[in-house]
């Protein structure tokens, strides 16, 4: 679920760039399901063009499926409910495929999903990439030794936490969340990952809220967004 605040009090997103090699075996050697991938092998130029056309179609279906709820959870906020997207199995599979496509050849070892809807999309993305999944949680939710990264909100501050043993040093991490707005939360997630010795390969989001400048706050990795609104 994504919230669009008419006053920028948001956090979180990026740019489709490279197509992903198809990975279409689900067997003892590979855990990438064929129904998520489509064609195998690296994309040639015509294939890349077709892939981008398909991503545009998926983005349009996402925008059509989002349920806009005005004045929720408080007056002045237009809440973008993503549960219709999650509830459509075919669309969800296509969404996850398109969210990870630019990172298929980037040797991602772990996906860092931002609480809470980043857990849903990030877990699915990790499965498709054959990577581990790590939750970036709000304070006080993790039971083991934690690393913490604080970030500013419009009124106050918040923080994200992850276990200190989330991955070995030198791991390659993709940050996933549902929405990119002002970019504060996503930036903090990237800093949290780097503080734990990882290289941030990039960020991937389902939806970007236009006009809030979130992507300008994300440094040192590719930023990919499926739909804009």
Per-segment meaning from a language model:
Residues 120-129, 189:
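Short Gly/Thr/Asp-enriched flexible loops that form oxyanion-binding sites at enzyme active sites
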Residues 131-174:
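Short, glycine/charge-rich flexible loops or terminal/linker lids adjacent to PRPP-binding catalytic cores
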Residues 42-54:
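Short, Lys/Arg-enriched N-terminal segments with co-localized hydrophobic residues
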Residues 52-108:
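Active-site-facing substrate-recognition patch
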Residues 2, 8-10, 16-21, 25, ...:
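Short amphipathic, helix-prone segments within low-complexity/disordered or flexible regions
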Residues 178, 183:
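Conserved G/P- and acidic residue-centered "switch" motifs that form tight phosphate/ATP-binding loops
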Residues 108-115:
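Short glycine-rich phosphate-binding loop at a beta-alpha junction
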Residues 54-58, 64, 187-229:
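PRPP-dependent phosphoribosyltransferase catalytic core
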């Amino acid at each position: 679920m994504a919230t669009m605040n008419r006053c920028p009090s948001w956090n979180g997103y990026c740019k489709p760039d490279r197509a992903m090699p198809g990975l279409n075996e689900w067997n003892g050697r590979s855990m990438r399901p064929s129904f998520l991938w489509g064609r195998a092998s690296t994309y040639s130029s015509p294939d890349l063009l077709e892939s981008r056309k398909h991503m545009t179609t998926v983005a349009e279906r996402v925008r059509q499926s989002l349920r806009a709820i005005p004045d929720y959870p408080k007056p002045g906020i237009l809440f973008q409910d993503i549960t219709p997207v999650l509830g459509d199995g075919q669309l969800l599979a296509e969404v996850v495929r398109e969210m990870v496509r630019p990172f298929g050849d980037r040797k991602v070892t772990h996906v860092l999903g931002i609480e809470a809807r980043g857990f849903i999309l990030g877990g699915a993305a990790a499965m498709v990439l054959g990577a581990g999944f790590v939750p970036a949680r709000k304070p006080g939710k993790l039971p083991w030794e934690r690393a913490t990264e604080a970030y500013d909100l419009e009124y106050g501050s918040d923080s994200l936490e992850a276990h200190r043993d989330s991955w070995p040093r030198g791991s390659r991490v993709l940050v996933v969340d549902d929405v990119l707005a002002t970019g504060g939360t996503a930036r903090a997630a990237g800093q949290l990952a780097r503080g734990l010795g990882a290289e941030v390969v990039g960020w991937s989001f389902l939806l970007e809220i236009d006009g809030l400048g979130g992507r300008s706050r994300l440094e040192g990795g590719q930023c990919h967004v499926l739909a804009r609104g």
